[in-house]
Amino acid sequence: MAQKTIRVGSIEIANDKPMVLFGGMNVLESRDMAMQVCEEYVRVTEKLGIPYVFKASFDKANRSSVNSYRGPGLEEGMRIFEEIKRTFNVPLITDVHEPHQAAVVAEVCDIIQLPAFLSRQTDLVVAMAKTGAVINIKKAQFLAPQEMKHILTKCEEAGNDQLILCERGSSFGYNNLVVDMLGFGVMKQFEYPILFDVTHALQMPGGRSDSAGGRRAQVLDLAKAGISQNLAGLFLEAHPDPDNAKCDGPCALRLDKLEPFLAQLKSLDELVKSFPIVETA
């Protein structure tokens, strides 16, 4: 089946094109750390020839505990993003949590992200779609792959077909997520690019009582499984010191492992996409 291509500047995002990377950190902890993280991503992706979009959140609106760090907020977050874009000349992606934020974020960021927990909130979906920006739609942990069609239709009816789907795992009992690899094939029927959010798929929601646990040691194994499915690319979070990260440290790749990690995945992506398509239906 034909696969759509979404363009962000010079980057082409499609399931049948070389992998792209949406990568960065979970939340903006500080301006200096954001610059450090982006600099390393840029160095590695330029060396390996991987198209790159910087990712971070200005607000984590769905933390487990009221005492958990949320981020610098919208205004300061946009200032940091603008500096990153000026300094490194990279496209940006961040998530939007309320309808009134959509237009403000779309003025700064090249891609706006619909959070998984909010993916059925029609007012938010429509507000984001009406900006005309490219939208990365996270698949909710509680939705079946085929149900993503309804969210795509909401965006299309609001006049936006610049859409990307992102798998981040499905709830499996309590405090656990699993990734159904068959779901990628289901979502490919919609013809939009699909990313795999490998770090969030390793979450153990509420696994540490007041915050999420995770399985960082398995990040390469799961990333290889996802990339083997002929996807548009990977969504990845890394941190200089994951054990002391302010959010989702147990899932984050160590920043100093970024280059060997991505080198293996790029080689795998090239191998998988070199094979002819075999129709088995």
UniProtKB/Swiss-Prot annotation:
Question: Which is a GO BP term held by this UniProt record?
Answer: keto-3-deoxy-D-manno-octulosonic acid biosynthetic process
Please give the InterPro entries that the UniProt record associates with this protein.
Answer: Aldolase_TIM, DAHP1/KDSA, KDO8P_synthase
Pathway, according to UniProt?
Answer: Carbohydrate biosynthesis; 3-deoxy-D-manno-octulosonate biosynthesis; 3-deoxy-D-manno-octulosonate from D-ribulose 5-phosphate: step 2/3; Bacterial outer membrane biogenesis; lipopolysaccharide biosynthesis
Pfam families, per database record = DAHP_synth_1
Q: Name the catalysed reactions.
A: D-arabinose 5-phosphate + phosphoenolpyruvate + H2O = 3-deoxy-alpha-D-manno-2-octulosonate-8-phosphate + phosphate
Which GO MF terms are attached to this record?
3-deoxy-8-phosphooctulonate synthase activity
- Which EC main class describes this enzyme? transferase
Q: Does the keyword Lipid metabolism apply?
A: no
Which HAMAP family does the UniProt entry name for this protein? KDO8P_synth (MF_00056)
Protein name, as recorded: 2-dehydro-3-deoxyphosphooctonate aldolase
Supply the source organism for this entry: Pseudomonas savastanoi pv. phaseolicola (strain 1448A / Race 6) (Pseudomonas syringae pv. phaseolicola (strain 1448A / Race 6))
